[in-house]
Amino acid sequence: MLLQGTHRIGRMAMLLALADENESPVLSIPKGWKYCTGKVGSMNSQKVVAAMETAAKSNQVIETDVYRETHALYHAIMEALYGVTRGQIQLADVLRTVGLRFAIVRGRPYDGKKEGEWVAVALYGTIGAPVKGSEHEAIGLGINHI
């Protein structure tokens, strides 16, 4: 079980999430890997999760009718949200809002085929009070096996 240096799934997700719309991260996505990117902003963490799950399904990053894929994605999203929110998933209840870019990457980061596929979710953007100018940058990463 050796992590391939060119197949660092978390790094790829972070670079995709950090890239501005007019930037193209210089990435060589391994053959057979899938990914999607998008934006989400809300005071509701459920809406943040739903937007990313919908993007992953509509871009065929995960299969819609396979529970374990949705479950793996959910845990990767929650892990990334913990990073952005410093372990406090609450947003609206404590008057916080987020504006995030996200990337979801699915692939095989290990050289052993038995290790299977993994999913990485990267979030980058701002979090703060729902007042323009009262936010700061935040970043989060979640990785889970499928």
UniProtKB/Swiss-Prot annotation:
Pfam families with a match to the protein in the record: HutP
GO MF annotations, alphabetized: mRNA binding
GO biological process, one term: L-histidine metabolic process
Database matches in InterPro entries: Regulatory_HutP, Regulatory_HutP_bacillales, Regulatory_HutP_sf
Keywords annotated in UniProt: Activator, Histidine metabolism, RNA-binding, Transcription, Transcription regulation
Segments crossing the lipid bilayer: none
SUPFAM superfamilies the record matches: Hut operon positive regulatory protein HutP (SSF111064)
Protein family (similarity comment): Belongs to the HutP family.
Protein function: Antiterminator that binds to cis-acting regulatory sequences on the mRNA in the presence of histidine, thereby suppressing transcription termination and activating the hut operon for histidine utilization.
Subunit structure: Homohexamer.
Protein name in the entry: Hut operon positive regulatory protein
